[in-house]
Amino acid sequence: VDDTDAAHARALERGARTITAPTENGMGRGAIIEDPHGAALGLFTAAPGATDGVNPHGHGFMCWCELVTPDPKASAEFLAHVLGWTSTEKDMGDFTVTIASAGGHPVASLWKRCDDDAHPWKRARWYPYVQVDAIEVASARARTLGARLPCDLMPIPGVGRWQPTYDPTGCETALLEPSQCATGP
């Protein structure tokens, strides 16, 4: 974000709860909030020069996020107010997904959570995707480091191949090997 304190204030205006107040952290200024539906979100403004030389694209970088939420429309409005994101709905046949964009570029999808209390998508939360060059190698390495891979590697037509993982602490992350021209799930 351009201004962590201002984004934090806008989030509070829309019903967010502060987890960590805006704080300097050596690389910039950050805060962590919980949105009105309970999903945690970090806000960060890099210090001048802190990200010089960093290319946030390619192997090992976060390339996409999904927000699982009880109300994608309300969440899109919250993100528009706090982050300035825009959103559009995309018909996926059996369901509709909301695609959020920053600066005209798609950055996240917003999904309606599952209403089954036993389903892991019952809780509102962000689900990050990390780009990898070779998904079989990255998946094997994750397993070696103690990750649980709950299902087989799966294709996402027109996007690439992905592998959901749970690290040894239970944190969910997806590995994504994008197709040549993919820009997000």
Predicted regions and their residues:
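Core segments of cupin and vicinal oxygen chelate
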Residues: 13, 21-28, 32, 67-107, ...
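N-terminal beta-strand motif that seeds the catalytic metal site of vicinal oxygen chelate
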Residues: 44-77, 82-85, 125-128, 176-185
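Short glycine-enriched loop/turn motifs at secondary-structure junctions
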Residues: 25, 58-61, 121-125, 157
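Long, histidine/aromatic-enriched segments associated with O2/redox biology
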Residues: 81, 100-104, 108, 112-114, ...
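Short helix-capping and inter-helix turn/linker motifs at the boundaries of alpha-helical repeat units
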Residues: 21, 55-56, 119
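Vicinal oxygen chelate
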Residues: 1-37, 72-73, 128-172
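Conserved short beta-strand elements that form part of the metal-binding/catalytic scaffold
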Residues: 36-47, 86-123, 167-168, 172-179
